Every structure is written in C-alpha cells, then in structure tokens.
C-alpha cells in the first residue's frame, strides 16, 4: 500500500493535478477488483475516483469507481458503435488509451476522434466529474419562481461548480437570473467544457452549473404541478472521458491532443530509473582499455593475412 503514497508524492512533486486543484483525485487500479484495504488507503490519501477495470459505483458521495466504457482510441480498434452502445448501457464514455506499448507507438484513430468531437458530449475527467456532482438546493419558493443555492463540492473534491437539472411540470420557464452579486451567463450547445452558466432545454426544463453559495432565481408562467431538482451533467451532455494508461511521458503523450476538445485523465507512472551513474564511467574506462588491445590484434591479424596471401 506504500505505492499509493509514493505515486501521489511523485505526481505532486512534478505537476498540479488539474486546473481545479493541485491534489490528484484519480488513481488507476489495474485489476478487476480492489479489496477494502486498498480503497481505504486511497481515501486516506485523498483519492476520490478509481478505475477503470473495477465495476462502476457512483452512488457513494465520498468515493467513486468507474469502469471502462466505449472501448479504445486505438486505430482499427476504436468504434463509434461501441461508444454509443456503452453510453446507452452505462450513461457515460470512459475510453482507454495507451500511446506506447513497449517500443511500439500506438496510432490513434483520427476519424473516430473527429466524430467524437462532433457529438453532444461533456468532455471531462474523472476528478472533474466527481467534484461537480453536487446539485443546487432549494433556498426559497414563491408561486411562480424558485431560488436555488449552489452547494459545496463533494467531500474531498475540487472546488468546482455543481451541475443541476431543474424542471417544472405544467408551466413555462421565462427567466433564469443570478440574484446575488455574481453573473450567470447563458450556455450554448457549443459549450463542451465545465464552466458556470445555464441553458434552457425546453419550455419546462433548464440545466445549470453554479458555484457554492450562488443564488439563482428561476421564474415561470403558469401553475406548476410539480418541481424537480436533481443532479445533472454539464450542459445536459453525456460525460465523456478518455484515460491515458501507463503514462511515462506526459508532454509527449498529450502533444497530439493539444488542439482536441477531448479531456484526458492521465494515469502517470514514474519513468524508469537510469542505471547508477558509475556504470557509464566504468564503460568508458573499459572501452579505453580494450580499444588499444583490439587495434593491436587487428593490425597483427591483417599482417598475418597479408603474409599468408603473399605466400599463396
């Protein structure tokens, strides 16, 4: 279990885990199951999501497990049908990617990547999805309006705005406005990355992403029969994640995706240590000592061959 601590210390010494926070929340478990000791150790070290061969469980507000969903990004393996089928089954996409296997570079499927980027997906990461899964709560209600209040991120999550789905049966939503000192912008269908805002989906429902303590008033016309407030996904899109496994060179592996809309959860591994530095000087000394002997041997061998040739 010390490997959990060592992995975290290695990562935090190299880079911030996310734009949302410096501490990592995601940990790759390379087996189909994990006993309670491993999961407890992950929690104790501040990790909040593990995957991606463990069966999914997103019902625990303190720790999630996410299984693979949607296959791979590798050329000849990537499949739009697999992605759609697994989203239908699991409610999200969580694709596998490994840029290099031993000494072989793996090619990504550019056609599938282009297709993915054209879909109504929320491009997110394990930690971001977990951290944003805190819907707003009801603060006040009148005959034709309701005030929602942003809640805090899940225990141990990054400080990110939470996603809420709101609907009102039998009425038509006419206005969504932030009534404290903040500003809440309207989202469009072109927004695929988590940020504060709202989008009216139809006359009776709206999706919102609001930070802790923000006050948002929703107003409608008509007599509301029923009001629903529940956890949503950003912009009402399907969560889409890609996971880079066995990442030994983050810069090199992420470079091909710098212009992509897709967001990766990179499971970083330390680069293999070089052999102790004294070996190189010893090799140099060995080469220096051996070279003159080899040269003398070669000269003697050539002279012998020349003499033998002259005798013939």
Kindly label every feature range from the protein language model.
Residues 1-73, 102-108, 272-280:
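Catalytic domains of cell-wall/extracellular-matrix polysaccharide-remodeling enzymes
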Residues 18, 84-85, 139:
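Short boundary motifs at domain starts and secondary-structure transition points
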Residues 49-56, 94-189:
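C-terminal domain-boundary segment and adjacent tail
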Residues 75-86:
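A short, acidic, amphipathic alpha-helical segment used as a generic capping/interface helix at domain edges
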Residues 145-300:
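C-terminal beta-sandwich/jelly-roll accessory domains of carbohydrate-active enzymes
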């Amino acid at each position: 279990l010390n490997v959990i601590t060592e992995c975290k210390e290695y990562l935090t010494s190299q880079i911030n885990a996310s734009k949302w926070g410096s501490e990592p929340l995601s940990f790759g478990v390379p087996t189909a199951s994990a006993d309670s000791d491993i999961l407890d150790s992950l929690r104790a070290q501040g990790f909040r999501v593990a995957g991606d061969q463990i069966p999914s469980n997103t019902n625990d507000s303190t720790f999630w497990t996410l299984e693979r969903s949607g296959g791979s990004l590798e050329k000849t393996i990537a499949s739009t049908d697999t992605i759609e089928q697994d989203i239908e089954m699991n409610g999200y996409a969580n694709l596998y990617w490994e840029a290099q296997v031993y000494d072989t570079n793996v090619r990504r499927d550019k056609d599938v990547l282009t297709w993915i980027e054209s879909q109504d997906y929320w491009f997110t990461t394990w930690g971001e999805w977990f951290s944003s899964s805190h819907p707003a709560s009801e603060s006040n209600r009148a005959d034709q309006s309701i005030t929602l209040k942003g809640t805090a991120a899940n225990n141990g999550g990054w400080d990110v705005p939470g996603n809420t789905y709101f609907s009102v049966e039998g009425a038509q939503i006419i206005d969504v406005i932030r009534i404290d000192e903040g500003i809440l912008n309207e989202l469009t269908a072109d927004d695929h990355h988590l940020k504060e805002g709202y989008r009216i989906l139809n006359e009776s429902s709206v999706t919102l992403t609001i930070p802790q303590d923000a006050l948002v008033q929703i107003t409608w016309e008509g007599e509301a029969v029923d009001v629903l407030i529940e956890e949503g996904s950003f912009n009402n899109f399907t969560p889409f994640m890609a996971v880079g496994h066995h990442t030994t060179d983050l810069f090199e592996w992420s470079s091909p995706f710098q212009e992509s809309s897709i967001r990766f959860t990179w499971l970083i591994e330390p680069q293999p240590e070089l052999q102790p530095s004294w070996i190189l000087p010893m090799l140099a000394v060995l080469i220096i000592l051996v070279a003159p002997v080899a040269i003398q041997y070669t000269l003697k061998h050539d002279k012998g061959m020349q003499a033998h040739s002259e005798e013939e």
